Structure formats: C-alpha cells, structure tokens
Amino acid sequence: MKFFAISLFGAALLGACATPVADAPEATLVEARAAPAEVAVAETAPEAEMVVAPAAIDVAAVSGALAAAETRSDEDKARDAGRKPAEVLAYLGIKPGDTAADFIASGGWYTEVLSIAVGPDGTVYAQNSEAALALRDRAYDKALTARLAGDRLANVVRKDEELTALTIPAASVDVALTGLNFHDVYNAYGPEAAVGFLSAIRGTLKPGGVLGVIDHAGVPGADNNELHRIDPALAVASAEAAGFRVEVNSDILSSAADDHTKNVFDPAVRGQTDRFILKLTNPE
C-alpha cells in the first residue's frame, strides 16, 4: 500500500491525459472474391503452420515458482498469502511471454511477481514518477534499485518517467497492473485526474489488452480519503469514462475481517483489507 502525492497529476496530466483515448477504429470489412475459373489451382496447397497461443499461467506452478524464487525476500514472500498474486494474474489472463507493465511500481513487489509470471520470453516495464521515487528519503528508488541490481530480473525494463511522457511503446502491452494506488490518485486529485491516469495507461495497451486495478474497498459516505480507500463504484465510473470495458471481482481478495471503517494501516486490518479487482479491457 503506497500513499503519496504524485507529481504527474498536475496541470500537464489534467490537460493532456484527462481526455479519454479514442476508441480504436472499426476494422474495414473486405469482401473476398472468387478466383477466376481459368486460374489453375495448385494440386497440393502447402499446409498452414498452426500457431498455438500460450495458455494463461498455471496458478499452482506460478505459486510454487514465487515461493521457491531465491531472488525474493522472506518479507516479499510473506505478502503472498494476503495478495494471492498467482490467482490475481491468472484472473487478468497473463501468459508466459507476455509484455506486462507495473504502473506506480514503487519498490517493485508486483514487478517481480510479473517478471516470474511472464518468464524469460516476456518483458515487464516498471514505471514510477520522480515524485514517487523521492518519497521517504528515496526509499522506493533504493528498493527498486536493489531489486534490479546485477540484472537479477533480466526481463524488467525500468521506466522512471511521468505518465505524461511515457516511452513505453503505444499499443504494446498485453497486461498492465496498478496495485493499491488508484485511491490515492482519485482522492488526492479528483475524478478528472483519475480518468487521465487510466487513459494514459490504456494508450500503452494492445487492442484487447487488460489493465488490472487492485485497491482497498471503501463504502459510500465514508471518509475514504482519510481511510486510504475508494468506493469501487467510483473506480468503475472512472474506468468507463476512460473507455474501458469493465469487469469487477470482489471475491479473490475479499476479507470478512474488514468492516471498511478502519484506516488500511490500522493493525487490525493491515494486510487483510477487503480489496476489489477491476479487470479493464481495452476494446479491440
């Protein structure tokens, strides 16, 4: 859970990113024409090579890989029980070899999970703004630097840049993720900036690509800014305004121990908050 002021939601983002990305143009229908009768047809046409798309990750296999990974600290592994990373990524449809992105990656906990899930043939972008990296005497900067030291996560590409100046290629990402960040964007900067945040990420997704938004559930009428939560309905409205198709999952990370009245840092619920996942699809 990260709470911070994010500089990228200043005037530049409000002006440049708040406008939802335009829907992809519809494909042009081309009518096939029959070959003229006098054209000879080859007696034996070459067989088309069948390309089988990789299946989504195997939850048990990825869970085992995360538990066994010598690169992961004991502290990182201890969070798996509450965050259920393999189940979440399987729900989002990530596959070995995918191009993935972790937006507001902070110290890179989700970045490393994505790295293991996509495997050596995949790529993971880890994006942070300078404001995020500068927090707490550059704690996130130091943590991410240590995590990537010695090329230990060789498939990760670090992107220290604002969302208003992304160098991640447009329409290149299969699955993106932002974990426990969206409430900060919405609560600190309002719905327009929240739509801009999602729209900027949408621009990096392939047609049919998916963005997963994980956050602490709040309830209408509560002081969710103080509690570091968000009403899922507000997140859904922002995602729809940004042009996404929205699917909500309230089961994978649900927690009956959380009554939504406590600050997420309260020891009674810390690490056990009731969380929702938005599976946001960029229309094809």
Please tell me what each predicted stretch does.
Residues 14-16:
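C-terminal motif of bacterial Sec signal peptides marking the signal peptidase cleavage site
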Residues 18-21:
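Bacterial signal peptide processing site
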Residues 61-91, 95:
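Class I SAM-dependent methyltransferase Rossmann-like catalytic core
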Residues 95-106:
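Conserved class I S-adenosyl-L-methionine
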Residues 98, 166-177:
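A short acidic, Gly/Pro-enriched loop at the edge of an enzyme's catalytic core
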Residues 115-116, 192-207:
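A short glycine-rich, Lys/Arg-flanked "PGG" loop and its adjoining helix->strand segment in the class I
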Residues 124-125, 208-217:
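Conserved beta-strand signature within the Rossmann-like core of class I S-adenosyl-L-methionine
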Residues 242, 257-284:
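Core SAM-dependent methyltransferase catalytic element
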